[in-house]
From Swiss-Prot:
Residues 36-157 form the MPN domain. This is UPF0758 protein VC_0510. One of its GO terms (molecular function) is metal ion binding. PROSITE patterns: MPN, UPF0758. It comes from the Bacteria.
Amino acid sequence: MNPKTSEYQKQQRYQENEILEHAAEILANRYVRGDALTNPDATKEYVRCKLGSYEREVFALLLLDNQNRLIEFKELFQGTVDAASVYPREVVKAVLEVNAAAVIFAHNHPSGDSTPSQADRRITERLKDTLALVDVRVLDHIVTGDTCTSFAERGWL
């Protein structure tokens, strides 16, 4: 491998990551506490900018009030390049700490393929059932990679 090409690729990747970080900041400023998450495409793009640059899987929560206004975006678990352990107890704890009425789950696939795995579908169902016990609505689970996949849009919720 040509060392100059390798250095160029590293530099280009670094610049791309900087751009993504700035884009995430801009989107984060658009979705501040109190903003209603009513546009699915904008919500997917927000999640993609927040989680898209990670090299490991990260599972996060968009914690919402009764009017689906953002209370907090919380990164809860970090895993490996192809998996992240998600613990329902910790999810319930995070939701109740801010008195959220609804939640959107989000996680990234560093591979770029946003197709949800069977494990993704199972944990989503388990979390949905668990949160129903404390009257918290699960509105969506967004998986981000090169594109975003919405469980709600696929009719899986």
